[in-house]
């Protein structure tokens, strides 16, 4: 499993650049310095537990703008300890040419709040799992192959194995990028969603 620490946010405040005509000559160099993350974002950009979202770089549109939608399905109403579930992440926005996502599963509250909850795994060659060496949280996210659309949507299927013991509710935080494929952070739309799954009642 690749290990990465949470990467830097965009080094250049792009909106401020465009407000200053004298700075326009710097735009080309600025964009070259901005990470595009076609092979997957740095860990820690789902928007959950105080994290930023992908808008840390793709910031010229508001979060969850009308016209797009990010959904997660396949999670149980209540999870059974140790059981494996298949989650489907779908991102839609008219006109997008590429798409990306990042998902984390963490305990929602209690003493373990924010800690890794269970295990994430890809189901195919369109996603990978990375590990944040600082927080010890894993993230499943797109890779280069996973940026290609399925029909008119970003579509990924991942596996989540529930914690071995029913420690508490699990929070899933997901961010998605509906991208225009212009190799810059401009013109992209970021969406987030979250869900909470409680453990099954003890028998």
Write out the residue ranges for each language-model feature:
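Bacterial N-terminal signal peptides
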Residues: 21-32
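Sequence context surrounding c-type heme c attachment/ligation sites in exported
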Residues: 2, 31-161, 165-203
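N-terminal secretory signal peptides that target proteins for export/translocation
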Residues: 1-17
